[in-house]
């Protein structure tokens, strides 16, 4: 601690060191594990929202499923902080790379006379994407922001 009420790991001293980061790391990993399984087991809905400029959309969707699984498992492993950091960076980049598919999904859905999911789904999803980028970096111990206060 550096004279603040927030520990360097982002957890309140009352909650114990690292509990918040650890809990969110497990939650994010679970999210990506489930998403990865769905990308592999049921790729068609994901292929359908893949932008037309993406080559080999079916293969790309399968590769994204494998990337989600690998990132989630690397995030959870307890042995290597560098591997956890790499997973955080990889999952953050992944979230940036799939953003065009999320935008395409919103455009396709909202263009329908009766949208299936509507604005109540798509708008929060758009705002969630940068949060997923930050969360992957934070739980992967790549960044400390906003919980650190600089070098001094």
Model-predicted segments: where are they?
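Membrane-interface extramembranous regions
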Residues: 1-152
């Amino acid at each position: 601690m550096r004279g603040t009420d927030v520990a360097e790991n982002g957890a309140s001293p009352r909650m114990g060191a690292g509990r918040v980061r650890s809990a969110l790391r497990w939650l994010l990993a679970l999210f990506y594990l489930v998403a990865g399984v769905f990308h592999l087991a049921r790729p068609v809905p994901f292929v359908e929202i893949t932008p037309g400029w993406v080559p080999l959309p079916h293969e790309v969707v399968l590769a994204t499923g494998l990337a989600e699984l690998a990132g989630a498992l690397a995030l959870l492993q307890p042995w290597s902080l560098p591997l956890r950091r790499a997973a955080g960076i990889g999952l953050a980049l992944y979230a940036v790379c799939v953003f065009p598919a999320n935008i395409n999904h919103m455009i396709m859905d909202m263009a329908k006379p009766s949208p299936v999911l509507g604005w109540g789904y798509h708008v929060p999803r758009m705002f969630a994407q940068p949060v997923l980028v930050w969360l992957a970096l934070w739980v992967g111990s790549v960044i400390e922001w906003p919980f650190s206060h600089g070098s001094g």
